[in-house]
C-alpha cells in the first residue's frame, strides 16, 4: 500500500512539470484532465518553482487540456492570482476555440489574466515583457 501511494505521488509530480525557459521565465504545460486535486498540485508546484527560480513570468500552457468547466476555469484563475501575489505574472496559452467558446458560454471572465493564443506567442510576449526578443541570424 505504501509503495502504491509512493508511485501515485510520483505520477502526479511527473504530470506537473515546471521548466525554466529563460531567466525569469517558467513554463508549465498542463496535459489531460484537470480536477481539484491536480489543480492543487499544479499550484503548489508552480509556486515553489517561482520561489526557487525567482521567476517573473509563468507560462501556463493549457493546449493539452481537452475541456474546461467552470471549476477548472476558476482554479486556473486562482493559480494566476496566487502567482501574482509572489510577484510573478501568469500568461495562459493554448486556449483552443472549444475552450474559448466554453468559457464564454459559462460566463467566465478571465479579467486581467494575460492570455496568448499559442505557446509561441506566450514566449514572444514573455521575452518582450523582459525587454528581449528572438531574432533570426543570417548565416550566409
List PLM regions with ranges:
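Short acidic-hydrophobic, aromatic-tinged amphipathic segments that line or gate anion-handling sites
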Residues: 111-122
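A charged, well-structured terminal subsegment
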Residues: 120-136
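Short, charged amphipathic alpha-helical "coupling" segments at sensory-output junctions
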Residues: 2-13
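A short, well-ordered alpha-helical element
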Residues: 36-56
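Amphipathic alpha-helical interaction surfaces in cytosolic regulatory modules
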Residues: 64-109
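Short, glycine-/small-residue-enriched flexible loop/hinge segments at domain edges that mediate gating
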Residues: 51-70
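STAS-typified acidic loop motif
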Residues: 21-43
Amino acid at each position: 500500500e505504501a509503495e502504491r501511494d509512493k508511485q501515485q505521488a510520483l505520477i502526479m509530480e511527473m504530470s506537473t512539470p515546471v521548466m525554466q525557459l529563460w531567466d525569469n521565465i517558467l513554463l508549465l504545460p498542463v496535459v489531460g484532465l484537470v480536477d481539484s486535486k491536480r489543480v492543487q498540485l499544479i499550484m503548489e508546484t508552480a509556486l515553489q518553482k517561482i520561489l526557487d527560480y525567482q521567476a517573473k513570468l509563468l507560462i501556463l500552457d493549457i493546449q493539452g487540456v481537452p475541456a474546461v468547466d467552470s471549476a477548472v476555469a476558476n482554479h486556473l484563475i486562482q493559480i494566476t492570482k496566487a502567482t501574482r501575489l509572489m510577484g510573478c505574472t501568469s500568461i495562459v496559452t493554448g486556449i483552443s476555440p472549444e475552450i474559448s467558446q466554453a468559457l464564454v458560454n459559462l460566463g467566465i471572465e478571465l479579467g486581467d489574466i494575460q492570455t496568448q493564443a499559442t505557446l509561441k506567442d506566450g514566449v514572444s510576449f514573455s521575452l518582450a515583457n523582459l525587454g528581449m526578443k528572438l531574432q533570426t541570424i543570417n548565416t550566409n
